Amino acid sequence: MGKIIGIDLGTTNSCVAIMEGGKPKVIENSEGARTTPSVIAYQEDGEILVGAPAKRQAVTNPKNTLYAVKRLIGRKFDEKEVQKDIGMMPYQIVKADNGDAWISVRDKKLAPPQISAETLRKMKKTAEDYLGEEVTEAVITVPAYFNDAQRQATKDAGRIAGLDVKRIINEPTAAALAFGLDKTGKGDRKIAVYDLGGGTFDISIIEIADVDGEMQFEVLSTNGDTFLGGEDFDQRVIDYIIDEFKKINGLDLSKDAIALQRIKASAERAKIELSSSQQTEINEPYIAMANGAPVHLTMKITRAKLESLVEELISKTLAPLSIAIKDAGVKVSDIDDIILVGGMTRMPKVQEKVKEFFGKEPRKDVNPDEAVAVGAAIQGSVLSGDRKDLLLLDVTPLSLGIETLGGVMTKMIQKNTTIPTKFSQVFSTADDNQPAVTIKVFQGEREMAVGNKALGEFNLEGIPPSARGTPQIEVTFDIDANGILHVGAKDKATGKENKITIKANSGLTEEEIQKMVQDAEANAEEDKRLKEVAEAHNHGDALVHSTRKSLTEYGDKLEAGEKEKIEAAIKDLEEALKGSDKAAIDEKSAALSAAAQKLGEKMYADMQAQQAAGAAAGDAHAAGADGQADAKAQHDDVVDADFKEVKDK
């Protein structure tokens, strides 16, 4: 069995990790970074860029550069959160035939799982490059507060990327695994995982216990907001910059897609810099034109100003904290450790608010960008059987139920129920001689079904005619370990039953997923072909360059016919290099190599002659040196004698 990799599919950044020698390892991507921007760009020539290369060209290609797509995954176009995003994003969010929110790029409609699959494919390739083998299985994380439709859509994205998703696990739970892995022997402890990422916020209360030598991670409660994160913080800064610029220059930059993209990049940079400094400067020259002259954007932003802009957003995270503590049945003072996850938790004001709430400092020994991927890799090692001393008990974040008479939401499974779980309840008909019942499934906490998220519906038909309230219809809810719901209904009198795996009454059909998988495979083939063409081009270019250089140096040693043959072969190869036919380039490269063989022989002969001449010169030099040595030796034989002059007497 191959490795099961762990992937944190983030709103802003993604990360991949594996277990190696019993220890988790975060893998660097092809750019040498440990995290990859969740940005996908669709180029005019059909090429798809993912990560840093996509982010770099966003300013010049704003309408076809997609980011924060996770905020749309598993959502309907008409949801208020999606409508809010439409006004914020430079790309076009459209309504799909099934009512889902999709994105229009270069005259094509793309589903969010299809786009997210590009990021997952990059993560898969990153792991494969490191391991040197194919990877087909993964554990992918999602925000704890993701509903059934969002979880199913994430699983679909994995399938489109060519991955068998062995488990979908909650991000705070994954972070707890990463934190608790090396905390054995420290006794039972309750931890709070505060996860404020690029697009979502989660809080989970988790108990880590040692049960008969096995580490047990039990989620006691979870809460959050799937539409609150760093993107919203960025938007506050963007709005402030646009307003200030308008006051000073009278120009509205919000309608200029390219200017908006530059401001977004500046706002994100400023937000990050203000986590470590008190003041930063935004400097975007030539942001607009006024009266034929360029206008520059220069502005200072202080940490205090940033904090005042986002104070309300930080405060919005506090209500879920209180609910999670209450639902877990614990007191704030019972929490032993607070773990911060997600890039936004680097903001000093966020840390300060968390400290105020819990009355203690959050821990700083967990990497907020990598902990989730590490936890996913740990869970992968549990699923593969490599690790047997760890048990994870997660929960369903929202209540699940069906619509009953009067539009009431009858809850079958309460929120924060440990999963996997199964629950059955008997219902009956509302009318006399009713031949069928429609089971409408909802997820949420409102008392009336209409106020909750509709997950799907199905019919149970063929109920024998009888008075209302007589038939016994048993409805069963079954949630698997991924948090995905399966619902069945059975007429106890006839034994007739109907079952479905809840796929949001929108969602992608099996046919759509298969088509997207095929498209992705075709893209992979095309990418491989383009790479091979590029390599052939590079080889051809290098061959032309080196042959030309050699021809300049040694061409005069060739016969006229040989030289002409090489020059003709160079010309043919240069012509082939203007196109993208790999076979033609390879053929002309081979022809040039063959034609240049004589040139190579002349070069080799010349080099040998030079070496021989060098050796002869060396011998002559050595002989001269020997003569000098002999002469010196002869002189060395002479004995210097002392003499005394004798004078005549």
UniProtKB/Swiss-Prot annotation:
Record's compositionally biased regions (Low complexity): 608-631
Similarity field: Belongs to the heat shock protein 70 family.
Annotated function: Acts as a chaperone.
Molecular function GO labels: ATP binding; ATP-dependent protein folding chaperone; unfolded protein binding
Superkingdom of this protein's organism: Bacteria
Matching CDD domains: ASKHA_NBD_HSP70_DnaK-like (cd10234)
Tagged with keyword Phosphoprotein: yes
Region (Disordered): 608-649
Species annotation: Herminiimonas arsenicoxydans
Induction of expression: By stress conditions e.g. heat shock.
Compositional bias segments (type: Basic and acidic residues): 632-649
Keyword Chaperone: yes
Modified residues (Phosphothreonine): T200
Protein name: Chaperone protein DnaK
Keywords from the UniProt entry: ATP-binding, Chaperone, Nucleotide-binding, Phosphoprotein, Stress response
Transmembrane segments: none
Xref: PROSITE patterns: HSP70_1, HSP70_2, HSP70_3
Gene name linked to the record: dnaK
One Pfam assignment: HSP70
